[in-house]
């Protein structure tokens, strides 16, 4: 991807627009899928925006997949998260090979990685909200929310993966650039995403 951006702009590293293209494309595709699922979901009396919209998307997923909406939302959001984080990771490796160490923290590849990791965490949150709105009976009750048992490890993995991102910047400032991917902070992010 970086090579294509470099060729398109005629400069090393490509233009800012070219480097944001993969993430932007994924977000547009995500928005289209969410809109289609919302359209496919059945509205219910008493749906309140924006939570009602999330519940309606869950109904669309139930209608499409046959599994409970809260589980389908968590699975779908997690798969999207892994795709975005994977594209960000791939782009980041290419960036570092071509350009070396970043001058700033929020490059397009880093933003893709962080967005993917945040989406893992949001999968647990969305799954919990839809389970609560749908009246799911199994799981842990916390402050009026019904947290399905499977959302607990998903949320913990999401928190671990997201927390690795700021710690990685501190690590690089303290110890410099890693020669390999196997620093503790990289492993925290990679393992959090992988076990999702």
Task: Give the role of each language-model region.
Residues 26-31, 76-88, 154-162:
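Alpha-helical transmembrane segments
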Residues 103, 109-154:
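Membrane helical hairpin/interfacial module
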Residues 23-40, 111-129, 188-196:
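Hydrophobic cores of alpha-helical transmembrane segments in multi-pass inner/ER membrane proteins
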Residues 104-106, 139-156, 166-196:
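Membrane-interface helix-loop-helix junctions at boundaries between adjacent transmembrane segments
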Residues 40-74, 132-151:
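Membrane-interfacial, low-structure loops and terminal tails that flank and connect transmembrane helices
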Residues 2-6, 83-99, 159-176:
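C-terminal ends of transmembrane alpha-helices
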Residues 1-18:
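Short, strongly hydrophobic alpha-helical membrane anchors
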Residues 43, 94-98, 122-141, 166-176:
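Transmembrane alpha-helix boundary signature
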